[in-house]
Amino acid sequence: MSDLSTLRQSYLDRISAAADGDALEQVRLAALGKKGEISGMMKELGRMTPEERQTTGAALNRLKDEIDAALRARKQGLEDAALDARLKEEWLDVTLPGRPRPQGTIHPISQVTEEVTAIFADMGFRVAEGPQIESDWFNFDALNIPPEHPARQEHDTFFMARAGDDPRPPQVLRTHTSPVQIRAMQATGAPIRVICPGRVYRMDMDQTHTPMFHQVEGLALGKDISMANLKWTLEEFCRAFFEVDEVELRFRASHFPFTEPSAEVDIRCSWEGGKLTIGQGESWLEILGSGMVHPKVLAAGGIDPEQWQGFAFGMGIDRIAMLKYGIPDLRAFFESDLRWLRHYGFAAGDVPSVAGGLSR
């Protein structure tokens, strides 16, 4: 046992004297490596009598544990000392301002889509989506738009190219998101409350029109839904979206193939000083179209028009974004101008909600 005591002290001294990690590793290998001195002594236990093995084995295990603990402690001490030395050599000015990292912004179209979704979700509407390439049946026939209707002409609608002998029905880039309403009715039946936001396509290009733009349409079906429900829904939407206490809407008789009766909706506003103010003034501004769903459209969606009725409405997301945020030219939405995006964009944390506020 006295030999083990001497061996213990020898290794503890060598561990204390190790000046770096390499020297410490040499001590570890000499003591506890596969060919180390203590490891070799452990291998000799098999040749001893049971009594000797019990006594010597316990002593060797204690020695091994003590050496291992000393090695770990010394290693940590060397690492701490190296860190202290490096910190003393390096100089860091904690008052120096950080380098700004480039930040992206949320596009106004994405932001307004989220705002609209949040408002209608609060009224119990869910979001429905559908394909942007539609058959002419979903885009026209199911919506009571006959073959002779002007909207079906090639100068208004993007028809997909196809071979002359292709037996499939004509395909178009959808001109509105109304086909999604047909698909939603076919999928779930009535009652139903959905909004259908998405891209739509028409052959038009000027300051307030682009070949691709964004639209949101809404559909609500029930047993006793009337124009009064439509009026309340649109008033609540406009009040929440434009963030004003009072709004006044004007319903003008119009014609849409998929609704009967149909109405275009104007909102009272003021242009005093060249600035648009919603909810006051003597002017009126058209913002959306609406009406009671035509019985033929209900039938195309698999709904019995004798038992169910409802309303539908639609508006351009790009247009209401321009009105709310004072954006003068629709084409700028799609030009990918970083300066424009920084000016009109929204921070990633500006998540709209009815309770917390829609806009910054």
Curated annotation (Swiss-Prot):
Binds 2 magnesium ions per tetramer. Keywords: Aminoacyl-tRNA synthetase, ATP-binding, Cytoplasm, Ligase, Magnesium, Metal-binding, Nucleotide-binding, Protein biosynthesis. GO terms for biological process: phenylalanyl-tRNA aminoacylation. Its EC number is 6.1.1.20. GO terms for molecular function: ATP binding; magnesium ion binding; phenylalanine-tRNA ligase activity; tRNA binding. Its main location: cytoplasm. It catalyses: tRNA(Phe) + L-phenylalanine + ATP = L-phenylalanyl-tRNA(Phe) + AMP + diphosphate + H(+). The keyword Transcription does not apply. InterPro entries: aa-tRNA-synth_II, aa-tRNA-synth_II/BPL/LPL, Phe-tRNA-synth_IIc_asu, Phe-tRNA_ligase_II_N, Phe_tRNA_ligase_alpha1_bac, Phenylalanyl-tRNA_Synthase, tRNA-bd_arm. The keyword Membrane does not apply. This is Phenylalanine--tRNA ligase alpha subunit. It comes from Paracoccus denitrificans (strain Pd 1222). The lineage of its organism: Bacteria, Pseudomonadati, Pseudomonadota, Alphaproteobacteria, Rhodobacterales.
